Structures are given as C-alpha cells and as structure tokens.
Amino acid sequence: MLYLNRSKFQQFPFHLVTPSPWPIVTSFSLLGLTLTLAFTMHGIIGNIYPLLLSLLVVLLTMTLWFRDIVAETTYLGDHTLAVRKGINLGFTLFVVSEVLIFASLFWAYFHSAMSPDITLGNVWPPVGIEAVQPTELPLLNTIILLASGTTITYSHHGLIEGNRKHALSGLTITFWLIVTFVLCQYIEYSNTSFTITDGIYGSVFFAGTGLHFLHMVMLTIMLGINYWRMRNYHLTSTHHVGYETTTIYLHVLDIIWLALYICFYWWGV
C-alpha cells in the first residue's frame, strides 16, 4: 500500500469533525431567540413575529446540523465505539444539567410554598389564585406519560431483538402519546385563571411546567427523527445511539413530570 493511501486511514478511533458552520450559527440563532423572547415578554416588541422568525431559524439550523450528524454516523461510519462512548458521556452530563435546572425551580417553589409571607396572604396558593386541579388534565397527562414510557421500552426491546414490526409500532404509539400530552398541556395553559405574571406562584408554576413542556416538544421532534431513521434502516440492533438517548430522555422527563405533578399540582393545591 502506498504511503499516500495509507495516510488516509486514521490510527485512532476518534472522530475529527470537519469544519462546520452549525455551532456558531446555532449560537447566534439561540441568542436571537432569547433576546426576542425577552423583548416580547417585556413589551419592547409589539408583535410575536420576530419571536416566531427566531424560532424558525433555530429549527432550521438544528435540522441542518442533525442532517450532517446522520450522514456522519450512517454513511461515513465516523461513530466508532469510542465516539459512541463519548456521546453517551456527553448526554449523561446533559441530563445531569437538566435535573439541576429543575432542582432550582423546585427550590424556588418550596421556598415560597412552605413559608408564605403576608404578601401572599400567608397561604399557598396565594390569595386570588385558583390552582389547577390535579384530578383533571394533569392526571390524564400523567397516565399518558407513564404509558409512553411503557411503549418506548417495548419499541426499544423490539429493536434490540431485531423485531422491526414491534420496534416501529411501539415508536409510533409513543410519538402520538407525546403529541397528545403536548396538546393537553396546551389546553391546560389556555384555561388557567392565572398567568406567568401573577406573582411567585404563576412565575414558578409556568417556569417549571413550561420548561418541561418545551422539552416535550423537543422530544416529539426527536421521536419523529428516530421513526424516519428506523423506517429507512439507519438503526440496527447494536448501533442506535440516537434512539437510545431519546429513550433515556423520555424516561427522565417522565420522572421529572411525576415530581412536578406531586409537588406543583397535588401538594400545591
């Protein structure tokens, strides 16, 4: 083998990423989304169109970035065992950071709920706040999420065992369960008697449940991508890192929702 040909092969298992515009483009698009969201909430921007445009740019850059990642793992073979271990480690740290974010919101909630001062009427929920009843839509959403955890596990085991029919059917059911959850959560928000500006209760309630809602929207996109990849035979029984991280992501969001339901809906009422 000639030296020139031999030099094309790596002597290590790690992926040297080629120059990509997506990290810097995504950073600026997220900055634009944050600024337009803050300006819209404070009334500096009089309409919602700049916010929607920023969100569209973020979704577009994410789509293009995910396209490159799919090409690297499926067609170029860049995701070796060492690379997959690194991805799993990075995703684990991401989950830890998400748990810490929600922990800070629970801290803020209990800080006010366990010792309400005179400005809150010395009661929790504060005077004038009609809390969402835990036996209505929140209970239905809890059942839906628990069911989705079961169906995604069924799908995952089907993929591991090489049963394509079970894997696809379980993933399809999971996708529609999560879509139903998102719609029910939207209906709940549309019918609440308070908003995010109604004191500490409204702020913490919508910050906690709203952040979880945004994660569920992201989960819907991830499930859709995995369904498309599974239909196109991108995933195998031994190589499905994206699908596996999506499964873990769903289970983590299930646990966080159970904590939100117990603390914000059941105990908080």
From Swiss-Prot:
One of its GO terms (molecular function) is ubiquinone binding. GO terms for cellular component: mitochondrial inner membrane; mitochondrion; respiratory chain complex IV. It catalyses: 4 Fe(II)-[cytochrome c] + O2 + 8 H(+)(in) = 4 Fe(III)-[cytochrome c] + 2 H2O + 4 H(+)(out). It is an enzyme of class 7 (translocase). It is a multi-pass membrane protein. The keyword Transferase does not apply. SUPFAM superfamilies: Cytochrome c oxidase subunit III-like (SSF81452). GO terms for biological process: mitochondrial electron transport, cytochrome c to oxygen. CDD domains: Cyt_c_Oxidase_III (cd01665). Its EC number is 7.1.1.9. It is found in: Mitochondrion inner membrane. InterPro entries: Cyt_c/ubiquinol_Oxase_su3, Cyt_c_oxase_su3_dom, Cyt_c_oxidase-like_su3, Cyt_c_oxidase_su3-like_sf, Cyt_c_oxidase_su3_a-hlx. Keywords: Membrane, Mitochondrion, Mitochondrion inner membrane, Translocase, Transmembrane, Transmembrane helix. The chain crosses the membrane at residues 21-41, 44-64, 90-110, 138-160, 167-187, 205-225, 248-268. It comes from the Eukaryota. Belongs to the cytochrome c oxidase subunit 3 family. Component of the cytochrome c oxidase, the last enzyme in the mitochondrial electron transport chain which drives oxidative phosphorylation. The respiratory chain contains 3 multisubunit complexes succinate dehydrogenase (complex II, CII), ubiquinol-cytochrome c oxidoreductase (cytochrome b-c1 complex, complex III, CIII) and cytochrome c oxidase (complex IV, CIV), that cooperate to transfer electrons derived from NADH and succinate to molecular oxygen, creating an electrochemical gradient over the inner membrane that drives transmembrane transport and the ATP synthase. Component of the cytochrome c oxidase (complex IV, CIV), a multisubunit enzyme composed of a catalytic core of 3 subunits and several supernumerary subunits. The complex exists as a monomer or a dimer and forms supercomplexes (SCs) in the inner mitochondrial membrane with ubiquinol-cytochrome c oxidoreductase (cytochrome b-c1 complex, complex III, CIII). This is Cytochrome c oxidase subunit 3. It comes from Eremothecium gossypii (strain ATCC 10895 / CBS 109.51 / FGSC 9923 / NRRL Y-1056) (Yeast).
